Amino acid sequence: MLVLLAATFFIYISRLTSTDALQLIQRGLRGKSETFDANATIVPEISESKRVIFGPKPTDLQHEEALVASYADPFKAALSIFKLLGANKFHQMTSSKTQLRYAFVKLRRWSQRPIAEPKRSWWQWRSKTGNKSRDDLAQKRGFRSWWSGRHKAKNAKRVA
């Protein structure tokens, strides 16, 4: 609480000009307690030279011109967009044209990837429908299923 009070006091004092601060101190020393009137309170205007503490920093003209110059090159502009998209793993290549080509390849592959289906919960499992022939099951399940089924059938014939 004390830190918050000190920070508020510092901001209040830093925004006062020296003459306003001197008048405030003299009023406090004289012990004049005036009634507060919101309409009579004059808020001192901030001069152009002072910058509000919480306001934005002034823009640097050279920085702005550098940004415009960087976007004048279409390869640099596209590369900055790809870096924002996360396709910036091509720093070992020197040419920005080559970097751009690989970034396009990466994004094309990413856009053509199969859409992953969410994992099904147990209540979303499909129920088994009807009796299917062994050939259909073997074709669906693959070679290992066919081999194990054949092996069981062969052993059943020997026992019988």
From Swiss-Prot:
Keyword match Signal: yes
Signal peptide: 1-21
Stated family: Belongs to the RxLR effector family.
Biological role: Secreted effector that completely suppresses the host cell death induced by cell death-inducing proteins.
Keyword set includes Iron: no
Subcellular location: Secreted; Host nucleus; Host cytoplasm
Protein name as it appears in the record: Secreted RxLR effector protein 83
UniProt domain comment: Has the canonical translocation RxLR motif, but lacks the canonical EER motif, which characterizes most oomycete effectors identified so far.
Keywords: Glycoprotein, Host cytoplasm, Host nucleus, Secreted, Signal, Virulence
GO terms under cellular component: extracellular region; host cell cytoplasm; host cell nucleus
List of glycosylated residues: N39, N131
Motif RxLR location, chain numbering: 27-30
